[in-house]
């Protein structure tokens, strides 16, 4: 080989190596746009394909949204002989929502049952018309703010004289659109956590919740946004700008008001404070004040004991025998941890539509690969605090359900679902350390492989599973 030819060959090889090394970086930069391109058709298909009211508590969430759309911003305890046993809370909503959901009730918790044309035909004849006191105790305490996409869709549906079913699909699409846009912002802001935020937003469980009529869609997406903003500030090791502090304040307040166990996210600004933390403390105090105000108000006017729970008895028992919490926690985790993992990845419907084992394990590996990408960069000022927040938040989830959903003296904590830990996962990711320098260039490639796995298999597996579960049988 003559010298000019040899030089061209070396240059070509060098260019190819640089191109390959830069591919993961280019893919990472394009993640926000790629997520939109991936999520829009998938979420719209999922919102249409999932039968009406076959997301967790979707009937009660929709009753709450209709109540807000009618001008009642807060739920309240219902009084009178009809609400004595069991006690309930709710407000004025449309009984047509219950009528429209009844034809699909036979499918809930019954994987052998499929929906039929007659179910849709009966339900589609119901429009908005009534306004009466209805109980929806498990959603009556929720604030109105995160129901805004559904409320807007209900206003449009009522103005256009749509049926309740058509308006429900519109509400799902509105919720999904809002959640995917917020998630895209979160991916755009994130530095270290960009891979894992994208992976969490693509999980089957997250996607299903994004296109439900519940507030979970915005709880998850707003948490991703808070983590993305905190991640960027911490990675760049600079003070937070005023608009960033405002965004964190608003988002974290809405998250904690909607689900008090996530109130610990209010502490995240302290994980990135540099020098004097006066401004960050101010943000934290403001967030905690908003959460406390709504929690006290909603507990006073709308909270009722459910599922045989009695918080007073439970608290007295804890004070009397605090060390009994250790075996209760141990039994709960050993009994249900595998279920929590499956539900975190995705058990659809009313926890009655499981996904194949190979896919659940593959998605778990893909999620772990996305976490490795976090280790390609150095962490922010106080990564340990993010871990403390995630652990405290997880404990708060168990504690809240032990008090409000578990029967007194029960040996296990009842009512915990894997999806409750999705908002805490990106917080935990902030705590991961940087990997040794020699391995860092490989990590983005592993994360990219995980994202590609999710992008290919999540739509294929989820759509096929829903089609066979609800329509085709088997």
Predicted regions and their residues:
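Perimembrane helix-loop-helix junctions
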Residues: 229-246, 263-291
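Short acidic/glycine- and proline-prone juxtamembrane loop motifs at membrane-interface regions
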Residues: 212-219
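Start-transfer (signal-anchor) and selected internal transmembrane alpha helices
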Residues: 1-44, 281-287, 378, 386, ...
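Transmembrane helical bundles and short interhelical boundary loops of multi-pass, membrane-embedded
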Residues: 293-295, 302-318, 416, 441-474
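Membrane-interface helix-loop-helix junctions at transmembrane boundaries of multi-pass membrane enzymes
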Residues: 29, 241, 277-281, 372-392
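Interfacial juxtamembrane loops and adjacent helix segments
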Residues: 72-170
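Membrane-lumen/periplasm interface segments of multi-pass, membrane-embedded glycan/lipid transferases
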Residues: 285, 298-377
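Transmembrane-helix signature of polytopic, membrane-embedded enzymes
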Residues: 160-165, 184-207
